[in-house]
């Protein structure tokens, strides 16, 4: 491959106590929490809106955020849920502890922006991470490409909220990633209109009526109406009076760190969505006039880099509902390891793991602070999908409420590090836990 040497003088345009890279659910929680503690926080996002997959990615629903007795993403996450309820009374659950929230993307991105600006976070959109300047294991600055050109940001502490662990990996932190044969598939979520909800309810083919949907999928696959034998039909969610969000179909073997793979995944996903549009119109009552009006601007990546941290949260910890002395949160979503290949057998393996890993009412696993601390980089925390864990734990903690929890913990840890003039590893754990409890975090069973 041909190579060039690229040299350019780049202005250090911004300085902050804490720079958060990536405004997905985890990065937003980190930025708002750190700023709420008094730190000067800069949040940089490559897109034109906050929220990542929860908004730009068009993910239509929050995965469970409760253990059946209490809301687990207490603190930042609970504030988001309260504001979602206030804006969407007609679709809000009567009992938030035991129900699901549908995501209205426009409302959610405004809620995120309100929480960020109210806490004093400086937001910069359309700024894409381009390079990292590291000296002796410490990030001195990060370089971004923006409409104004390239610029650098310096900070005492950096937080990686990129989802893919890009900042950490480019800074020299070790990581692991599943092979192309094992990696979970991705989904391009979508927005649909023209649905007759009364007819849909009476038709019997709800997304939660698995047998009815599988029969229809099987018939369509055998008839050649769907190009792939993907029986893992993941979701239809009503997000407005006459619209729904689709978490439908998969693209397999996507490498989130490769622009060619991402591009092919997006192209293939949009083609498959048209297949499913025809399938729904033909086979599902109430969808005769339905149409897709929008698909996500981000491909729904379920698995990419997992940073190797000071501790690797594992499935045995999960199953034992283990608590940790440095626990900074708790969560309980089952191990939702989407099959890496289509087919009936792979679906059955997924269902077996998902059901067997479901925790009981009131149970949850602890999240230690150490999984946010990447090895070999001193002034960096990670949060969201790229935290240090095994694949089964990733399949639980990667969803939106889990990202709020790890983001909140990273933000508080960073703020205390700045205040104490120390590194994230030097933070007093008792003080960290005390401050998290003060803002509503759930730390113990």
Where are these regions (language model features)?
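Ligand-binding pocket scaffold of soluble enzyme catalytic domains
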Residues: 12-16, 26-27, 55, 151
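Short, hydrophobic/aromatic-rich segments at coil-to-beta transitions
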Residues: 136-142
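Flavin (FAD/FMN)-binding glycine-rich loop and adjacent Rossmann-like elements that form
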Residues: 9, 53, 145-146, 150-157, ...
């Amino acid at each position: 491959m041909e190579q060039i040497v690229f040299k350019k003088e780049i202005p250090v345009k911004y300085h902050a106590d804490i720079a958060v890279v990536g405004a997905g659910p985890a990065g937003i929680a980190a930025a708002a929490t750190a700023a709420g503690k008094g730190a000067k926080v800069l949040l940089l996002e490559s897109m034109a809106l906050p929220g990542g997959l929860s908004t730009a990615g068009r993910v239509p629903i929050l995965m469970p955020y409760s253990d059946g007795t209490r809301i687990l993403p207490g603190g930042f996450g609970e504030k988001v849920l309260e504001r979602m309820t206030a804006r969407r009374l007609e679709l809000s659950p009567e009992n938030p502890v035991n129900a699901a929230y549908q995501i209205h993307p426009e409302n959610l991105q405004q809620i995120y922006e309100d929480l960020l600006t109210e806490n004093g976070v400086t937001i910069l959109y359309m700024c894409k991470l381009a390079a990292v300047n590291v000296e002796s294991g410490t990030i001195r600055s990060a370089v971004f490409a923006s409409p104004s050109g390239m610029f650098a940001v310096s900070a005492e502490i950096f937080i990686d909220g990129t989802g893919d662990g890009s900042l950490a990996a480019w800074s020299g932190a070790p990581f692991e990633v599943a092979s192309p044969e094992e990696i979970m598939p991705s989904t391009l979520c979508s927005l649909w209109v023209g649905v007759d909800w009364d007819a849909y309810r009476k038709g019997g083919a709800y997304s939660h009526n698995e047998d009815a949907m599988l029969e229809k999928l099987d018939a369509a696959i055998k008839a050649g109406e769907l190009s792939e034998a993907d029986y893992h039909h993941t979701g239809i969610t009503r997000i407005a009076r006459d619209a729904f969000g689709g978490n439908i179909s998969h693209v397999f073997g996507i490498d989130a760190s490769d622009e060619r793979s991402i591009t092919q995944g997006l192209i293939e996903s949009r083609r498959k969505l048209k297949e499913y549009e025809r399938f729904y119109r033909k086979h599902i009552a109430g969808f005769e006039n339905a149409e897709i009006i929008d698909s996500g601007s981000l491909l729904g990546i379920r698995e990419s880099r997992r940073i190797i941290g000071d501790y690797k949260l594992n499935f045995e910890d999960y199953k034992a509902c283990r608590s940790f002395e440095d626990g900074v949160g708790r969560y309980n979503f089952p191990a939702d390891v989407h099959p890496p290949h289509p087919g009936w057998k792979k679906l059955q393996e997924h269902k077996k793991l998902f059901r067997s890993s479901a925790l009981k009412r009131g149970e949850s696993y602890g999240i230690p602070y150490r999984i946010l601390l990447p090895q070999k980089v001193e002034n960096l925390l990670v949060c969201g999908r790229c935290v240090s864990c095994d694949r089964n734990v990733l399949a639980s903690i990667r969803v939106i409420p889990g990202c709020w929890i790890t983001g909140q913990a990273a933000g508080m840890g960073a703020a205390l590090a700045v205040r104490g003039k120390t590194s994230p590893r030097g933070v007093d754990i008792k003080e960290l836990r005390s401050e998290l409890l003060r803002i509503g975090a759930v730390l113990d069973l």
